Amino acid sequence: MFAKLKKKIAEETAVAQRPGGATRIPRSVSKESVASMGADSGDDFASDGSSSREDLSSQLLRRNEQIRKLEARLSDYAEQVRNLQKIKEKLEIALEKHQDSSMRKFQEQNETFQANRAKMAEGLALALARKDQEWSEKMDQLEKEKNILTAQLQEMKNQSMNLFQRRDEMDELEGFQQQELSKIKHMLLKKEESLGKMEQELEARTRELSRTQEELMNSNQMSSDLSQKLEELQRHYSTLEEQRDHVIASKTGAESKITALEQKEQELQALIQQLSIDLQKVTAETQEKEDVITHLQEKVASLEKRLEQNLSGEEHLQELLKEKTLAEQNLEDTRQQLLAARSSQAKAINTLETRVRELEQTLQASEEQLQQSKGIVAAQETQIQELAAANQESSHVQQQALALEQQFLERTQALEAQIVALERTRAADQTTAEQGMRQLEQENAALKECRNEYERSLQNHQFELKKLKEEWSQREIVSVAMAQALEEVRKQREEFQQQAANLTAIIDEKEQNLREKTEVLLQKEQEILQLERGHNSALLQIHQLQAELEALRTLKAEEAAVVAEQEDLLRLRGPLQAEALSVNESHVTSRAMQDPVFQLPTAGRTPNGEVGAMDLTQLQKEKQDLEQQLLEKNKTIKQMQQRMLELRKTLQKELKIRPDNELFEVREKPGPEMANMAPSVTNNTDLTDAREINFEYLKHVVLKFMSCRESEAFHLIKAVSVLLNFSQEEENMLKETLEYKMSWFGSKPAPKGSIRPSISNPRIPWS
């Protein structure tokens, strides 16, 4: 580094040394002393001519002593210069060693830092690649699950449509059954009227028989003429006895049929009891399912709380929330199906009870008819006995009896015709009762089939609920795993950030150490420069002393040349020292610029910090979006629960009001117009109730649509369009206006025509 300076110093020392051991001048001799000594020597040489030899010898001795002193001083200065050169060489060697060791350390630290940086970059790249692969796999799995859930949702929609169709068919069957019941009631009323007419005719004929008895009492005088008629009457008596036997046989047959009907009634009661037991079982099962549903709702609430506490900012939570809403909709559909099954079973039981009551009434009416026929037969027997007594007592009334035979025969024929008509009516009643029993049996079979279908559907829904629970548990596990993975990723990011901070701190420390070492090097270089300056000054003094000695030994003429040479040397050493200083500074600056450690912190700090800030901002934005979506979905869930409560209340009111009104209308109008009036009244009540329900729901939806925010109103567009029968263009216009209100710089949508009620589209009743 200082090769040029070393060469110059060696040349100067070689010039300064004389061949044959030149004497040294002491360091303290200055230019003034040299000048004074030259002046003295000149004076002395000038005075040599005039002085004596003794003075010359004394002066020479003095000069020799002075020369010896100067040589001793020069030798001391030479030793000091040698020592200084040795110290300088040692310092240069130590400085070179220190520079080499520091450069090696810097290179090693730079290599280790670059290796660590490369390892960290590779690790970060591998970790990011792994995370990307994991997220892509998870996204694929979530998309597959989404497709599966959409297929399940489509199947559930199809099932719900099938259930609605079945419910409509059940409603139609109930309407037909009500019409048939009204017809049967009308027929029974007609038969009761005919039976009343027959009773009136029987009463009139009993009156006629009493009149005939009075006539027979009056005709006792004519018993002699009626002896022949008595024989005929006896024959007629035998025929009447045969008829009585026939009537008794028919009575026994009717009693047997009555017992059979009672047995069937008992069987029906047993079936009703079984149905009630099944109903109790179904209610118990529904209560258990409602408990399960409430438990699931509590789980859903707890999961929502956990999600709100976790505040995880990932997109798969949105899909989990969608699946949660789908599961809640499925639960609500199962509740509606259970309510429909309950209502249908309750209606079926009510219809069965009413039919059993009607059959009991028909049985009571048939028993009353049998009692009346028994009374008629007993009255006929009493009449026959009275006739026999009258025949025995009044044999002389035979002629009058012959006259009355024809009348009696006519009356008996009329009675026989009446009995035949009664038997026919009884047979018709029996056939109608049997038909009613068959219809009831068929309806019971249909109800059993419906019950089996509902049980199957309930089992299917239970199985689906189990599947949904399992899927929900799996989703919970997946969400927990995702949360753990996110926490691990966050921990890794924090660790990477800490490592980056530690590395930056290490780099700062190394920079500080470099600065300190550079400062130490600069101080040492300054000391070296000071030593070189001292050495140069010493060399200058030595050269001056040598010049003085040469001037003393030579003539005064040579002193001027020596002085000029010394001045030239001084002039040359100034730029040489400046060049050495500039070379040192340029070398130090080149080392500092070539050292890659100074450029590392700028290249190594910024990307990590920028990536962390971007990730934090994105996570915060995603967290805010997820929180808003959770709040909106919670609000929609609460709105759906309120709607379900309102619909339950309206359905309960409808179920409470409808049967009482129907019974009241049936009792008030028992004429021939019942067959046409009853179904029309029920249809009108159904329509009015449905309209009231639709109006209340429409009012609720419109008020909610007008009072809520734009983001919530955007979800209610479909309901408003369905209730108000909007067309697709009107619905799109509503969406565009809401989007214009929600946006900041959107353009206002152009009106596509006046909104008119869609008459062509039929109104779809809300269900």
UniProtKB/Swiss-Prot annotation:
Coiled-coil regions listed in the entry: 50-657
Mutagenesis / variant outcome for changing F695A: No effect on RAB6A-binding, nor on targeting to the Golgi apparatus
Post-translational modification: MARylated by PARP12; MARylation is required for basolateral export of E-Cadherin.
Every GRIP domain range: 688-737
Major site of localization recorded for this protein: Golgi
Effect of E696A: No effect on RAB6A-binding, nor on targeting to the Golgi apparatus
Keywords on record: ADP-ribosylation, Coiled coil, Cytoplasmic vesicle, Golgi apparatus, Membrane, Phosphoprotein
Entry's localization field: Golgi apparatus membrane; Golgi apparatus, trans-Golgi network membrane; Cytoplasmic vesicle, Secretory vesicle, Acrosome
Gene3D superfamilies in the cross-refs: GRIP domain
Superkingdom, taxonomy of origin: Eukaryota
Quaternary structure and partners: Interacts with RAB6A. Directly interacts with TBC1D23. Interacts with FAM91A1; this interaction may be mediated by TBC1D23. Interacts with ARL1; this interaction recruits Golgin-97/GOLGA1 onto the Golgi apparatus.
Miscellaneous comment: Antibodies against GOLGA1 are present in sera from patients with Sjoegren syndrome. Sera from patients with Sjoegren syndrome often contain antibodies that react with normal components of the Golgi complex.
Function recorded in the entry: Involved in vesicular trafficking at the Golgi apparatus level. Involved in endosome-to-Golgi trafficking. Mechanistically, captures transport vesicles arriving from endosomes via the protein TBC1D23. Recognized vesicles are then tethered to the trans-Golgi before subsequent SNARE engagement and vesicle fusion. Selectively regulates E-cadherin transport from the trans-Golgi network in tubulovesicular carriers.
Protein name as annotated: Golgin subfamily A member 1
